[in-house]
A protein has these predicted regions:
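Membrane-cytosol interface segments of multi-pass membrane proteins
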Residues: 1-163, 291-333
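Hydrophobic alpha-helical membrane segments
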Residues: 270-283
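Hydrophobic, well-ordered secondary-structure elements that form the walls
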Residues: 267, 278, 319
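Hydrophobic transmembrane alpha-helices
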Residues: 60-64, 134-143, 187-203, 247-261, ...
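Aromatic-enriched alpha-helical transmembrane segments of multi-pass intramembrane proteins
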Residues: 117-118, 141-235
Length: 333
């Protein structure tokens, strides 16, 4: 039986991803909104929580099933490759071609460079190989019982936290980001948080003092977000470096929440399909509205978000009718 609170968080997380993509990560993408528009400020908040929350939920779901080495590493990798890498290749190829052929889209690629989308991070699909690598790392650590107690988990999480902070600096800055391994390093601590919130829920959440400390540190994240917005430059870079320190307790508290909402639970049940296909809706929605002569920001934001959310749900239902299409584009048997 599904945990409705976590499914609610999953629905919220994927909606944040969609809205963030509609707005765009910078003035040159998405709706091409420049500073200091309020939607740019909104994106700073979305960017803070969207992927860490998505990753923590993935870790929580992984930990639901007790680890068993008897199933074998090969079997585990095949299942995760089917679920993550096959759709990455299929949907990524389709997205590349549509973006290349359709007028009015952002960041068109060259056909001669299409091979790169299977080897290096490509637009929103960077996350899928990153998550695949994270699953492989987690399986390997579990096979050696490195995370079967809170103490061992804390050591592993600290190591992951250090790796995430040195990610893309020093020597790593010069290393090609093959298979989105840098994204995996950046998201690894949050996956570990999800694992711990499932495996060690009683010692984590049973003490009020622990929860109070978590809340206090999590609230400091609000101050970091304001620094990133109001003091761009070195102060913002330092604040972003500290993001995981405030994000980790925030994620623990969110995963422990008991609130649920039927609408978000429903959206959450299609989260993976929405992630795979929402890029078509965000781009297509903006283009269609502009062709209709609609340039107002709010109608474009709401309409593109609606299309990018509901469209993939319809695509999911359509593809699910064919075994081959279901496997290629949704990663389901």
């Amino acid at each position: 039986e599904k945990n409705l609170s976590v499914e609610t968080l999953r629905g919220i997380a994927i909606l944040l991803v969609v809205v963030g993509h509609v707005v765009g990560s910078g003035p040159g993408g998405g709706m091409k909104i420049d500073f200091p528009h309020p939607l740019r400020y909104l994106y700073v908040w979305i960017d803070y929580i969207q992927m860490p929350l998505f990753t923590a939920i993935a870790g929580w779901a992984y930990a639901l099933k007790p680890f068993s080495a008897s199933s074998g590493f090969g079997s585990f990798v095949r299942k995760k490759a089917l679920r993550l890498l096959v759709p990455m290749a299929a949907v990524g190829t389709l997205y590349f071609l549509v973006q290349y052929l359709m007028p009015g889209t952002n960041n068109k690629g060259e056909l001669s460079q299409m091979w790169r989308i299977y080897v290096f991070p490509y637009t929103i699909y960077w996350y899928l190989p990153s998550l695949f690598l994270i699953f492989v790392v987690q399986w390997w650590m579990d096979s050696r019982k490195w995370m079967d107690t809170p103490g061992k988990w804390a050591v592993c999480c600290m190591a992951a936290l250090i790796l995430s902070r040195i990610n893309d600096v020093w020597i790593l800055h010069e290393v090609p980001d093959l298979f989105s391994f840098k994204g995996a390093l950046g998201q690894l601590p949050y996956f570990f948080v999800g694992v711990a919130s499932c495996r060690f829920a009683v010692p984590l959440y049973s003490r009020p003092a622990v929860r109070h400390v978590m809340l206090a540190v999590a609230l400091c994240g609000i101050a970091l977000i304001q620094t990133v917005w109001f003091y761009p430059g070195k102060c913002a870079s330092l604040s972003m470096l500290l993001y995981p320190v405030t994000l980790i307790p925030a994620l623990f508290l969110l995963l422990a929440s008991k609130w649920h909402n039927r609408f978000f639970v429903w959206i959450g049940s299609y989260a993976y399909s929405i992630y795979l296909f929402h890029g078509f809706g965000t781009s297509g929605g903006r283009i269609i509205l502009k062709m209709m002569g609609i340039d107002a920001i709010v109608p474009i934001l709401l309409s593109a978000t609606f299309i990018a959310t509901i469209g993939p749900v319809l695509v999911d239902k359509l593809l699910d009718r064919s075994g081959m299409l279901r496997m290629l584009f949704l990663g389901r048997k």
